[in-house]
Amino acid sequence: MKIDLAKSEIIHFVGIGGIGMSGLALIMHGMGFKVQGSDISFNKNIERLKKKNINIYLGHKKKNISKATVLVISSAIKKNNPEYLASKNKNLPIYKRGEMLGHIASLTKNITVVGSHGKTTTTSLIASIFSKTKIDPTIINGGVLNSLNNSARLGSSDWSVLELDESDGSFLEVMP
C-alpha cells in the first residue's frame, strides 16, 4: 500500500501504549511527523514517548482527534472506538499499524523477522550485530532492547531491522 504523508500531518495513534504502536510512533516522530496518541492507561512505553514530548491522551475520546489528520489503529482497537468512529465521520485516512509499518519499510532495505517463537530475541541479536558495524539501521522490535532502553530507534542508514507480527497479518504489509 502506498501511503502519501506530508510532514504537516498530525498522526494520531489509537493504542499508542502497545509495544508495536509506541515503536512506530517513535520512528515517525523521529522522521519529523507530528505524532500524538491515546491509550486506556499509562505504561513504560508511554513514559518513553512523553520524554520525547509526544502528546498522549488517557482514554479514548472523540475530542482527542480534533487536530489529527491521519489515524493509525492497533489491531486491538474495536470498530466502536470513539476515536475510530470520529475519524471515519471526518473522513480521515485510517491505517492499521501493519500498513504504516509497511510504509516505513518501503523507505529502506529490510531485514525482517517473522515467526511464532523467538522473533524478539532474533531481532535483538540482528540489531546488536548491526550496532557493531558502521551501518546504523532503523530498528522496530517487539520488546525493549537493553542497549537502547527502547523498542525502536530511527537509524541514519537506508537499512531497517523489523520484527513483524504474524498474529494480525501485519507481516503481509512489508516487502523484505
Residue ranges and their predicted role:
Residues I56-G59, Y95:
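Short acidic-hydrophobic, aromatic-tinged amphipathic segments that line or gate anion-handling sites
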Residues N43, L58-K62, D165:
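Structural motif corresponding to alpha-helix initiation and N-cap regions
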Residues M1-N45, K50-N55, K67-L71, N89-L92:
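ATP-dependent carboxylate-amine ligase
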Residues D4, I27-F33, K50, K63-N64, ...:
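Phosphate-binding loop of NTP-binding sites
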Residues G37, Y57, V161-E163:
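Generic enzyme active-site microenvironment
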